[in-house]
Amino acid sequence: MNYFNTLNFRQKINQIKKCRFMEKKEFNKKNEILKNKKIVIVGCGSQGLNQGLNMRDSGLNISYALRKNSILKKNQSWINATKNNFLVGDYESLIPNADLVINLTPDKQHSNVVKELQKLMKKDACLGYSHGFNIVEKLRNIRKDITVIMVAPKCPGTEVREEYKRGFGVGTLIAVHNENDYSNMGLEVAKAWAFSTGGHRAGVLESSFVAEVKSDLMGEQTILCGMLQTASLVCYEKLITTQNHPGYAGKLIQFGWETITESLKHGGITLMMDRLSNSSKIRAFKLSQEIKEFSQNLFQKHMDDIISGDFSSKMIQDWKNKDQNLLNWRYKTKNTSFEQSPDYDKKILEQEYYDHGILMVAILKAGIELSFETMIQSGIMEESAYYESLHELPLIANTIARKKLYEMNMVISDTAEYGNYLFSESAYPILKEFVKNINNTDLGSALPRNSVNNIELYNVNTMIRNHPIEIIGRKLRSYMKNMKTIIVG
């Protein structure tokens, strides 16, 4: 049985609903509480390295604890840490003196890692996570004299660093584990950690471990990763069947997600739809409604399996089977026609991504709204649902622009990658069947700018702008004034 299922109904609801948008003044103390403290990050992968770089640049003392075998073999974590001039040591040499130990190893390693860390950590130390899976989905009891906190940036580690270097940050959830707040200082430490990664600049939600895990799993399985992967494969194949050049088709998809979702950062679904002509907007709206209708049951099934723990049980079983399903899905993805598509050296103008990508816009709108709606129906608060659907989407799209789906799956967590493939396996045949009957002007060429009915356009605009995710989005984006724009690929 996992931790979540040991809670009674009232406790489950209270933890799922915990969500408070924090005011800027709550970060006035900056990271003073962590200055001159010994902070040890365990693991130096994508999140570990990039959070550590930000924290060091914010004036903190950071070192990395790796397994002795990793140090002897000089594996990738050792290379990441030493190349960036961090102090590296084994658990026994660094953990006993650490004031804050941040566990940023892959989820599947957490049980064994935390078991070792607890034996070495001093009394009244803090143990940090950036994803609460190990706490919520497994019955993991932590020593009562250890304070357990979480700072969860809502994006891959690479984007945590890139946004920080731009002088901004990424939206972040912070939490203190109900069972482990020994010193009553957990929230203050979490705030200082979030400040040090730059999260305070983009907005921080005070949440719970439960709310973070359940919403995070839903977002990454559906719109953030699963829908992007499924749509990339299906849209590319459709473009090829309509006689588009493979290089052009690949580039339109690879860079199209990043270009189109850039508008989400600044003006939500409303701005994304406003980038289309009036006739294209109405067409995208109709397509999105159809996509929502046939996708609803799949989204709800994933949410139900996440809430019940069924998803986690199946994934943990795959871990025990040496990632048999995960590795098979990864191999299949690597060998898809989209991943193997040739380079295309001609420039695609920014507006062309919208004009030739009406279907892509429709898929994004449908997936964002459906993911958000399904989370809300399950008790997750609007702010959390926004962060885990619309807000993080441009940051995931950025990774596809670098090296297609390979890059996305390499930088997201092992848990996210598994959930992504699981969703895509079911969604792919459904979406593929749908696109058989779309118009050529829905993808790959532009829809003529025909005259439209004023009343129809007015009603479409009203429905777009009054969707609950747009209402909460306008509030949250008011905190995010300094976001930098991308260079169009």
Curated annotation (Swiss-Prot):
Mg(2+) 1 binds at D216, E220. It catalyses: (2R)-2,3-dihydroxy-3-methylbutanoate + NADP(+) = (2S)-2-acetolactate + NADPH + H(+); (2R,3R)-2,3-dihydroxy-3-methylpentanoate + NADP(+) = (S)-2-ethyl-2-hydroxy-3-oxobutanoate + NADPH + H(+). Its cofactor is Mg(2+). Substrate binds at S413. NADP(+) binds at C44, G45, S46, Q47, R67, S77, D107, K108, Q109, G157. One of its GO terms (molecular function) is ketol-acid reductoisomerase activity. Mg(2+) 2 binds at D216, E388, E392. Pathway: Amino-acid biosynthesis; L-isoleucine biosynthesis; L-isoleucine from 2-oxobutanoate: step 2/4; Amino-acid biosynthesis; L-valine biosynthesis; L-valine from pyruvate: step 2/4. GO terms for cellular component: cytosol. Its EC number is 1.1.1.86. Residues 208-343, 344-483 form the KARI C-terminal knotted domain. SUPFAM superfamilies: 6-phosphogluconate dehydrogenase C-terminal domain-like, NAD(P)-binding Rossmann-fold domains. Residues 16-207 form the KARI N-terminal Rossmann domain. Binds 2 magnesium ions per subunit. Involved in the biosynthesis of branched-chain amino acids (BCAA). Catalyzes an alkyl-migration followed by a ketol-acid reduction of (S)-2-acetolactate (S2AL) to yield (R)-2,3-dihydroxy-isovalerate. In the isomerase reaction, S2AL is rearranged via a Mg-dependent methyl migration to produce 3-hydroxy-3-methyl-2-ketobutyrate (HMKB). In the reductase reaction, this 2-ketoacid undergoes a metal-dependent reduction by NADPH to yield (R)-2,3-dihydroxy-isovalerate. Belongs to the ketol-acid reductoisomerase family. This is Ketol-acid reductoisomerase (NADP(+)). The lineage of its organism: Bacteria, Pseudomonadati, Pseudomonadota, Gammaproteobacteria, Enterobacterales.
